């Protein structure tokens, strides 16, 4: 198993490299007669693509989606959905110095050890360029979730560096390039990122994702728990180093009398510390999860490393890189949670019918 496919009932298989001719994917298991609007898929891709602001990579990719199978007259046919996205703005010469050198905290060294060969141009398969495929698959999964159960998956930037961002409204999230949940901290974020860029450094982030209208009963105990699969989905995204469900790591500071989500016949659940999942199965509450993205190591500040011969070297990474990879990660996080929920929804219906 090569690890390029995700899901069991709704399966996305991804292919392509950062500086190859194209990237793309195949979706197998999508139900028939799901309305698909290619413009809506393109909107999702436009949210992820580079060069959207001064604070992300200046690589200019149109990210135009080409759907070539599985959709007829605007509806899915139940057969595999194939799509491809051309790579048009590669600058492979920027990576020539790293043909024989390993960039710190990148996949260069581990890919070389695993395969004995690696595509050093833009990180090859390990590049975040691959996530455009996930966003495409996630857009189709969103259509399935919306049309079958009215499930809505949205995410926002909840922390950047030392700045915790208070949630104000979804309208605020969609009205700025940072996916910041409130208008009051926008100038602080902008100034903070400018300072980071000026110093030639980078910074980490946290993205919070919320899934509403998820029916109770999704999840397969014990090894395919819904929260376990969400964690796997989010951890599979480039640069993610931690995942939390519900209150997550802050649960360690709480008492059972506080954390337990009590409920009454009249009001239902009185809290949602568990993040909408109990015993690995959705409870019918809103599902809440978060993913922490490390600061990218593609920065001009010199760093110690070694080359393929095992000799010491000094590396300074220049070119078109994100000072904060989390800024473009919001639609990717949404996509992976949507893929997970879609997979579990179809598995639940296949096993237990529509309840």
Curated annotation (Swiss-Prot):
Task: Write down the required cofactor(s).
Answer: FMNH2
Q: Name one GO molecular function term.
A: FMN binding
Q: What is its EC number?
A: 4.2.3.5
A Pfam family of the record is Chorismate_synt
Q: Does the keyword Kinase apply?
A: no
Listed InterPro entries: Chorismate_synth, Chorismate_synth_AroC_sf, Chorismate_synthase_CS
Please write the reaction equations for the catalytic activity of this protein: 5-O-(1-carboxyvinyl)-3-phosphoshikimate = chorismate + phosphate
Q: Which Gene3D superfamilies match?
A: Chorismate synthase AroC (3.60.150.10)
Under CDD domains, the record lists: Chorismate_synthase
Cellular compartments per GO CC: cytosol
Cite the cofactor comment.
Reduced FMN (FMNH(2)).
- Where FMN binds, per the record, is at 125-127, 238-239, 279, 294-298, 320
* GO annotation, biological process: amino acid biosynthetic process; aromatic amino acid family biosynthetic process; chorismate biosynthetic process
Keyword tags = Amino-acid biosynthesis, Aromatic amino acid biosynthesis, FAD, Flavoprotein, FMN, Lyase, NADP
Q: Where does NADP(+) bind?
A: 48
UniProt cross-references to SUPFAM superfamilies, sorted A to Z: Chorismate synthase, AroC (SSF103263)
Tell me the pathway: Metabolic intermediate biosynthesis; chorismate biosynthesis; chorismate from D-erythrose 4-phosphate and phosphoenolpyruvate: step 7/7
Q: Which NCBIfam families match?
A: aroC, PRK05382.1
Function comment: This reaction introduces a second double bond into the aromatic ring system.
On subunit structure and binding partners, the annotation says: Homotetramer.
The record's comment on protein family reads: Belongs to the chorismate synthase family.
Q: What is this protein called?
A: Chorismate synthase
């Amino acid at each position: 198993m090569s690890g390029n496919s995700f899901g069991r009932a709704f399966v996305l298989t991804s292919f392509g490299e950062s500086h190859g001719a194209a990237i793309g994917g195949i979706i197998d298991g999508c139900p028939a007669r799901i309305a698909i609007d290619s413009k809506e898929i393109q909107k999702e891709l436009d949210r992820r693509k580079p060069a959207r602001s001064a604070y992300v990579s200046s690589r200019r990719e149109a990210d135009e989606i080409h759907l070539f199978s599985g959709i007829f007259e605007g509806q899915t046919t139940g057969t595999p959905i194939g799509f491809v996205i051309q790579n048009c703005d590669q600058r492979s010469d920027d990576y020539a110095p790293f043909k024989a050198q390993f960039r710190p905290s990148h996949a260069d060294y581990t890919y070389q050890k695993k395969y004995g060969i690696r595509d050093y141009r833009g990180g090859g398969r390990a590049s975040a360029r691959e996530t455009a495929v996930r966003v495409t698959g996630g857009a189709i999964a969103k259509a399935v979730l919306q049309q079958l159960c009215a499930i809505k998956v949205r995410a926002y930037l909840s922390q950047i560096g030392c700045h915790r961002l208070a949630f104000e409204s979804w309208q605020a999230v969609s009205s700025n390039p940072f996916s910041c949940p409130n208008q009051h901290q926008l100038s602080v974020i902008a100034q903070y990122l400018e300072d980071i860029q000026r110093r030639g450094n980078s910074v980490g982030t946290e993205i919070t994702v919320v899934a509403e209208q998820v029916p109770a009963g999704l999840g397969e105990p014990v090894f395919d728990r819904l929260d376990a699969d969400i964690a796997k989905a989010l951890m599979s995204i480039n640069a993610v180093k931690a995942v939390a469900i519900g209150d997550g790591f802050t649960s360690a500071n709480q008492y059972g009398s506080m954390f337990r989500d009590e409920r009454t016949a009249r009001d239902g659940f009185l809290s949602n510390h568990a993040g909408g999942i109990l015993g690995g199965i959705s409870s019918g509450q809103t599902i809440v999860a978060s993913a922490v993205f490390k600061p990218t190591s593609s920065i001009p500040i010199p760093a110690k490393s070694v080359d393929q011969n095992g000799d010491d070297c000094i590396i300074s990474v220049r070119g078109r890189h994100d000072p904060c990879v989390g800024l473009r990660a919001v639609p990717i996080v949404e996509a992976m949670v949507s893929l997970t929920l879609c997979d579990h929804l179809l598995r639940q219906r296949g096993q237990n019918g529509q309840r």
